[in-house]
Design a protein with these regions (language model features):
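Conserved nucleotide-sugar donor-binding subdomain of glycosyltransferases
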Residues: 67-99, 106-107
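C-terminal alpha-helical cap of glycosyltransferases
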Residues: 312-316, 326-343
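A short, glycine/small-residue-rich beta-strand->loop->alpha-helix junction that serves as a flexible
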Residues: 7-21, 205-209
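Nucleotide-sugar donor-binding patch of glycosyltransferase catalytic domains
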Residues: 138, 245, 277-318
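A donor-sugar binding/catalytic signature common to diverse glycosyltransferases
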Residues: 100-103, 121, 252-295
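A nucleotide-sugar donor-handling region in carbohydrate enzymes
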Residues: 131, 137-205, 234-235
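Conserved nucleotide-sugar phosphate-binding/catalytic loop shared by glycosyltransferases and other
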Residues: 11, 29-81
């Protein structure tokens, strides 16, 4: 395993895994992934070697869709970080690691820096802002300071967003999975013979509130629309739903996003990027007080309060025209930047 690339993927949700799969598929390198749970399963499904070692504690979101106990989650994240750092240290010590790539896994980044190993950080979050109180935010600010210092010292920081490169930060644009077929063929493959509303919440159970609200809204207006609703709840949930089609886990969810007529989703970055690139009309509802999702939703003209307008939004968006598929994809540039470090 001489000179290999260790690719550490955050297991929090599936968004990190989806973009890392795209980058890895374009790299000519000896890659071993390290992740956990649903993310590890997805990486394995795409044929990559992955060590399923990470176990994270999910956000606590109440039935109304509001993030609870944010400070407690930050403290539990610190414990998770220390466990991940031990795992990363053991793996890096055992292998002749040429490069460490870490998608929002700052434990692996820390180990790489301590061992003077070239490293790449992939992130769309340059700082967090979960907590509101003065006392708790002081702890978060300290963590942000450490995160920023690690990024400053890293060989390269890849940001899957639009922007101007500076210092060691490279803004490569959205990184999304490629479509394997035409939209018409995909609709036939998935059995989409009517207008199709796709509801998805990513890789955790944090979006159950959105599934329930979306189904309720759909049931109240379905007699007025010729459309079916399909719910993809992700690999970590086992729930029964009435009146809609329910799928637990889909390897190629991105192709369902492309094939559907309307997407209703949490405002996670990877999902919003996929919908943007594929031109799919969408409704993005963030978890309340989840700063990153609220920012993503705001960029698309939505807020948490729109959850009470789902009926009107569904009717409006089902009549919206699709945008053209965007040709630009940051995966190629990300691959090129990483490949240059392997030479």
């Amino acid at each position: 395993m001489s000179g290999q690339l260790l690719f550490f993927t955050s297991p929090i949700g599936l968004g990190h895994a989806t973009r890392d799969i795209v980058i890895a598929s374009k790299l000519n390198a000896n890659i071993t992934f390290i992740s956990g749970e649903g993310a590890a399963r997805m990486i394995s499904d795409y044929g990559f070697l992955v060590k399923d070692l990470y176990r994270n504690k999910s956000f606590v979101v109440d039935d109304s869709g509001e993030l609870q106990c944010a400070f407690r989650w930050i403290i539990s994240y610190w414990s998770y970080y220390k466990k991940c750092k031990k795992i990363a240290s053991n793996l890096i010590d055992r292998n002749e690691t040429k490069l460490v790539v870490a998608d929002e896994d700052f434990a692996a980044t820390s180990v790489a820096l301590e061992n003077n190993i070239p490293n790449v950080v992939i992130t769309d979050v340059l700082q967090t802002s979960f907590t509101k109180s003065t006392l708790f935010s002081a702890v978060e600010k300290k963590m942000n300071k450490g995160m920023k210092e690690m990024m400053r010292k890293s060989t390269l920081v890849i940001i899957p967003d639009y922007g101007e490169d500076h210092d060691n930060l490279a803004y490569v644009g959205p990184i999304v999975r490629e479509i394997s077929s035409s939209r018409e063929k995909l609709r036939e493959h998935f059995g989409f013979d009517r207008k199709t509303i796709l509801v998805t919440i990513g890789g955790t159970d944090a979006g159950v509130f959105l599934i329930n609200k979306a189904i309720r809204a759909y049931n109240e207006i379905k007699s007025r629309i010729d459309a079916e609703m399909i719910v993809v709840s992700g690999p970590s949930m086992n729930i029964g739903l009435q009146g809609v089609k329910h799928i637990g886990y889909v390897k190629n969810l991105h192709e369902m996003v492309y094939a559907c007529d309307l997407l209703i989703s949490l405002a996670g970055r990877s999902t919003t990027d996929e919908a943007d690139v594929y031109g799919t009309p969408s409704i993005f509802i963030p978890i309340k007080n989840h700063f990153e999702q609220e920012d993503n939703a705001r960029r698309h003209g939505f807020s948490f309060e729109d959850i009470d307008r789902l009926k009107d939004l569904i009717l409006q968006k089902l009549e919206a025209a699709r945008s053209d598929v965007k040709a630009s994809n940051g995966a190629v540039r990300a691959m090129t930047l990483i490949s240059n470090l392997l030479k």
